[in-house]
UniProtKB/Swiss-Prot annotation:
This is DNA-directed RNA polymerase I subunit RPA1. Residues 297-317 have a biased composition (Acidic residues). Three distinct zinc-containing RNA polymerases are found in eukaryotic nuclei: polymerase I for the ribosomal RNA precursor, polymerase II for the mRNA precursor, and polymerase III for 5S and tRNA genes. SMART domains: RPOLA_N. One of its GO terms (cellular component) is plastid. DNA-dependent RNA polymerase catalyzes the transcription of DNA into RNA using the four ribonucleoside triphosphates as substrates. RNA polymerase I is essentially used to transcribe ribosomal DNA units. GO terms for biological process: DNA-templated transcription. InterPro entries: DNA-dir_RpoC_beta_prime (IPR045867), RNA_pol_asu (IPR000722), RNA_pol_N (IPR006592), RNA_pol_Rpb1_1 (IPR007080), RNA_pol_Rpb1_clamp_domain (IPR044893). Its EC number is 2.7.7.6. It is an enzyme of class 2 (transferase). Keywords: DNA-directed RNA polymerase, Metal-binding, Nucleotidyltransferase, Nucleus, Transcription, Transferase, Zinc. It catalyses: RNA(n) + a ribonucleoside 5'-triphosphate = RNA(n+1) + diphosphate.
Length: 638
């Protein structure tokens, strides 16, 4: 039966998804490009296009300035994003491992996943079923070939066993008609089994086809889709043929990852080299001239006609060396992989650009407040926030990388270096057109990638000193992150914890609560018992039994902590109250008590509170220890 709420609800939240910002979205969010390495000028004012540019909002500690973008002060200005345009493409440190897996899984010649075509088609159908919510059908589809073939194989084994047995006895028997009848019966049973399996296969495939044609999602699946996609992604990666491509029969070299900054193409093993020479008469050098750019140390003759070149004797030592893969080359590999395997990969990822970064978002000024040296130390200087210092390092590495390339190519001389640098700030350099084999250029790019990694995830830093500085990921994750510390399970008004200690003199249905917890945990009680709540309001926040807040009918909440006694008496006057008093916990209040880990229902039980004025621990009767699986050696309960 429809209710009034059904008519009021116009839409429902079906689900959420997370993705990386692309370059267009970053450009739309940003209010200014940041490329000035100087945060402040000589007069200690924020510089234009600097890391503390006033267009990105006002610092939370600055009570006087106004934001140049919205015109608000530090109280009302939400802050505005900026961006740093990277000189060249950098790797996304959060997807580095996945990028390495894809590089190892693709063929460097035909640019396809080294998985048989039938298995790729099967994975595509299973992914579509999972996206629609038909997880059972997707799992059956993966097992269908296995159980059908196993049943047929078992029948064949039975047939062979019977035939063999009858054949041995045939030498002893004179009558062979019985043997022929058994053979015919076993063969007929096998044919019936195969026909039955074919019919089951056709019925199941028709059911799958109807699901895919209707394209109707299954709504009652919860978050199981995420787990299923994660599992099938691992299955896809485990299905990759180690070296020889099943599509073009070419042996592929191994791709090695060096930390979180570089990829190297290793030389072919001796076994693969012999296999290539025996099957093709040459080593396929299309690995990969079209994408090697200036890094390729191979001769590019005949690459337009056949894409292949024979191994020359003078290049034998060169072939044994590992080759550095630039980000531009890896980007080209991923683009070609997506061109061929887009049906499968688009079901797993947004696109290949999530593995790379051309622009880096800069957070608002209010989230990067400066810190002062302090009056006690006699240092009145302001120091940059840790993230501001990391962003400044990225800008310096960005400029150093650009100048290294410009000097290497002799694009500019000393007189017009600054002018050309200003003109090219918005132009990204294509590394495939530069002599990237230079160790200086590779080192400059590695420093840029390292600085980006430190800012986003300092655990990927190569140097120990950089690992100690918290990046954006460290700001969010683990127990000390803002999600668990500030948002998830925040114990403010209705929860508290302390160490437990035994007390045989309280009842089994009671729990002893220290007074400091009782003053913190409040209960929102409507103003009905006037005299009782009057005393609570007058006692205030620091005297038990008291109150911490008063909530008025319009939703305004007033704290009693800093009120004077006269203000408290004025607030306790009853004038058609309809107020809510957030009073302290008192003896007799029912509580839910829990000891983690919560393994079964008795781990959370209800008790009546007894306020203990001079205690610092939660007091509990011995008989409740078994339910909570607790002992008194320092366990905590809440």
């Amino acid at each position: 039966m429809a209710t009034i709420f059904d008519s009021l609800i116009s839409s429902r939240l079906d689900g959420t998804r997370f993705s990386f910002y692309n370059d267009e979205e970053i450009q739309q969010m940003s209010v200014k490009e940041i490329h000035n390495p100087m945060a402040y000028d000589e007069l200690n004012n924020p510089t234009s296009h600097g890391i503390c540019d006033e267009s990105m909002g006002v610092s939370a500690l600055d009570k006087l300035s106004k934001c140049k973008t919205c015109g608000c002060d530090s109280v009302y200005c939400p802050g505005h994003m900026g961006h740093i345009k990277l000189t060249s493409t950098c790797y996304n440190p959060f997807t580095m491992k996945l990028l390495h897996s894809l590089l190892k899984s693709k063929c460097l010649v035909c640019h396809r996943l080294r998985i048989s075509p039938k298995r790729i088609e099967l994975f595509e159908i299973r992914l579509k079923l999972i996206k629609l919510g038909y997880l059972v059908e997707a799992e059956k589809l993966s097992d269908f070939n296995h159980f059908s073939l196993e049943s047929i194989d078992s029948a064949i084994r039975i047939l062979r066993k019977k035939t063999k047995g009858k054949t041995n006895k045939k030498e002893e028997k004179e009558d062979s008609e019985e043997v022929e009848e058994d053979k015919y019966a076993a063969k007929e049973a096998l044919e019936n089994l195969i026909q039955k399996e074919k019919e089951n296969r056709e019925i199941f495939y028709s059911h799958i086809s109807s699901i895919l044609q209707e394209d109707t999602p299954n709504e009652s699946i919860g978050n199981a889709i995420t787990v299923a996609i994660r599992d099938i992604t691992k299955e896809i990666m485990n299905s990759v043929v180690p070296s020889k491509c099943p599509h073009c029969d070419v042996c592929n070299p191994r791709i090695k990852k060096d930390g979180a900054t570089k990829f190297f193409q290793m030389p072919l093993s001796n076994r693969d080299t012999k296999a290539m020479l025996s099957s093709h008469g040459r080593i396929d050098m299309r690995i990969d001239i079209s994408t090697m750019g200036a890094i390729s140390e191979y001769d590019e003759e005949d690459d337009e006609s056949s894409g292949e070149s024979e191994v020359r004797e003078g290049d034998e030592e060169q072939e044994k060396k590992q080759k550095y893969l630039s980000p531009i080359e890896v980007l080209e590999h991923m683009r070609r992989l997506w061109d061929v395997e887009d049906t499968l990969l688009n079901e797993l990822f947004d696109n290949y650009k999530i593995f790379f970064m051309n622009n880096l978002l800069v957070s608002q000024n209010r989230f990067r407040p400066e810190s002062s040296g302090g009056k006690q130390s006699g240092d009145d200087r302001d120091y940059l926030h840790a993230h501001s210092a990391m962003l400044t390092k990225i800008i310096n590495a960005n400029i150093a990388f650009r100048r290294t390339i410009e000097l290497k190519e002799n694009l500019t001389d000393d007189r017009n270096l600054e002018t050309e640098s200003e003109k090219s700030k918005t132009q990204q350099i294509d590394l495939s057109k530069t002599e990237i084999t230079s160790k200086q250029v590779i080192k400059a790019w590695a420093e840029l990638q390292e600085s980006v990694n430190c800012y986003l995830d300092s655990s990927l830093a190569a140097k120990l000193e950089n690992k100690e500085k918290p990046g954006l990921r460290q700001l969010l994750e683990r127990k000390e992150g803002i999600f668990r510390m500030k948002m998830m399970g925040k114990r403010v008004n209705f929860a508290g914890r302390s160490v437990i200690s035994p007390d045989p003199y309280i009842s089994t249905d009671q729990i002893g609560v220290p007074e400091f917890i009782a003053r913190t945990i409040t209960f929102p009680e409507p103003a009905k018992n006037i005299e009782k709540l009057k005393r609570c309001v007058i006692n205030g926040a620091h005297k038990h039994p008291g109150a911490n807040f008063i909530e008025y009918p319009n939703g305004e909440r007033k704290a009693l902590e800093n009120m004077t006694l006269e203000e408290k008496k004025q607030s306790s006057i009853i004038r058609k109250w309809r107020k809510i008093v957030y009073r302290h916990m008192q003896t007799g209040d029912p509580l839910l008590v829990n000891r983690q880990p919560t393994l079964h229902k008795p781990s959370i039980m209800a008790h009546n509170a007894i306020i203990l004025p001079k205690e610092q621990t939660i007091r509990m009767h011995y008989s409740n220890c078994k339910s909570y699986n607790a002992d008194f050696d320092g366990d905590e309960m809440k």
